[in-house]
Regions:
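Active-site/acyl-donor-binding loops of N-acyltransferases
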Residues: 2-4, 8, 75, 137-170, ...
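Short, surface-exposed, polar/charged, turn-prone segments marking secondary-structure boundaries
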Residues: 98-101, 159-161, 181-185, 222-225, ...
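Acyl-donor binding region in acyl/amide transferases
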Residues: 55-56, 60, 78-150, 263-319
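A conserved beta-strand-loop-helix scaffold within acyl/acetyltransferase catalytic domains
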Residues: 2-88, 134-153, 161-163, 167-279
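A general structural signal for short secondary-structure boundary/capping elements
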Residues: 178-181, 199-201, 293, 304-305, ...
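Generic hydrophobic alpha-helical segments
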Residues: 115-119, 232, 343
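A short, structure-level motif marking secondary-structure boundaries and short turns
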Residues: 104, 167-168, 218, 274-277, ...
Length: 348
């Protein structure tokens, strides 16, 4: 039911004709998301190519009825520390939240089922030890026992708001009062200003470094690939798809945010706050400013992305889940590799 064409050459992938075809589908697809924007994909690839042995498996497909699909994957050939396991993963893997295929039209249940069945059969021909399909939202996976439900992804429908007052009315009494109180407390200290940057040249020296330092202190165990976030910020713009902003108090940064925006959706990706102002909740006030900005720009959704952090409850009115599937190679060599990894984990 599906015919696949797989691109396995990086030079072909970055050719203008291919990028144009990719961009066209990205703009038309009902399953479109910012994480498969060519810019974000290229930044991820440029980050990890010096760190990992990655080979492209960029899948283009067409059904008998003319539906089209694009799904960028890579074959990750791991080193001896990981038993030389070969794993097929989506582009972006753990750094990007969603990996939904880009369909030209919403696939029917039958079409979606055959897509996954036939694609997995095609991917098996690469003789990888495992195929890890992670980060596929509801509607882009099959509801069967092969797939497991993963993290919740809260979001806020912005179409119900036409102004900042509408947003305030939506918030619960406690949150609404806290926002007003913290803004008042900050303004008593000095001038409070929300600033976004149209290019990396506008970002004052030291701002990015302060942002990363604050984030690392808040989440010290979170892996950050060398230069990844720097490359993202270097491509920031007020017109997307990469957005970088700060909340200033008397010209001192008290909160930062690196996020994305694409086709009416704002993605709340990487916030950080200045620990010096922890009691004034600067991250919360920055989030408020970002949502107001999204309303003013006419966006229809504010996506809080993956995670069930408590704070998201008061800032969202909907949710969906991401789903995963793992397909293991049943050959003896693959079983031995996985046994080695399991034993290594048990030993610690």
């Amino acid at each position: 039911m599906w015919k696949f064409n797989i691109i396995q050459n990086w030079n072909c992938i970055w050719e203008k004709n291919h990028i144009d075809k990719w961009n066209e589908l990205l703009k038309q697809s009902p399953t479109s998301h910012v994480f498969y924007h060519p810019l974000l994909v290229q930044i991820w690839v440029n980050t990890y190519m010096p760190l990992r042995n990655l080979a492209p498996i960029f899948v283009w497909g067409e059904s008998l009825k003319g539906n089209k699909v694009f799904l960028p994957l890579v074959l990750w050939k791991k080193n001896w520390k990981n038993a030389f396991i070969h794993t097929i993963i989506p582009i972006g893997y753990s750094d990007y939240d969603y990996h939904d295929p880009l369909f030209l039209e919403h696939p029917t249940d039958k079409e979606l089922s055959s897509f996954w069945e036939e694609l997995i059969a095609k991917l098996r021909t690469f003789n990888a030890d495992e195929i890890l399909l992670t980060g596929f939202r509801d509607g882009c996976h099959i509801k069967d026992n092969h797939w497991t439900q993963d993290e919740i992804c809260p979001s806020l429908d912005l179409t119900k708001f036409s102004s900042e007052d509408d947003l305030m009315s939506f918030f619960g009494t406690k949150l609404r009062g806290d926002i007003r109180r913290q803004i008042r407390r900050l303004e008593e200290i000095g001038s409070l200003k929300f600033v976004e940057y149209s290019s990396v040249q506008e970002i004052p020296t030291g701002v990015f470094e302060q942002f990363m330092d604050a984030h690392c202190k808040k989440w010290p165990k979170a892996y950050k690939a060398p230069n990844f976030h720097n490359l993202l910020v270097e491509s920031c713009s007020t017109n997307g798809p990469i957005h970088f902003s700060v909340l200033l108090l008397n010209d001192e940064a008290i909160a930062w945010h690196l996020g994305f925006e694409w086709q009416g959706v704002y993605y709340y990706y990487m916030p950080a706050g200045n620990p010096k102002y922890l009691k004034q909740s600067p991250v919360k006030i920055h989030l408020y400013n970002l949502i107001v900005r999204a309303i003013n720009k006419g966006y229809y959704l504010y996506d809080h992305l993956r995670g069930d952090e408590t704070y998201k409850t008061g800032w969202s009115d909907g949710f969906q889940y991401v789903n995963n599937r793992c397909v293991r190679n049943k050959c003896m060599s693959s079983k031995i590799k996985h046994c080695f990894i399991k034993l290594k984990t048990l030993i610690g």
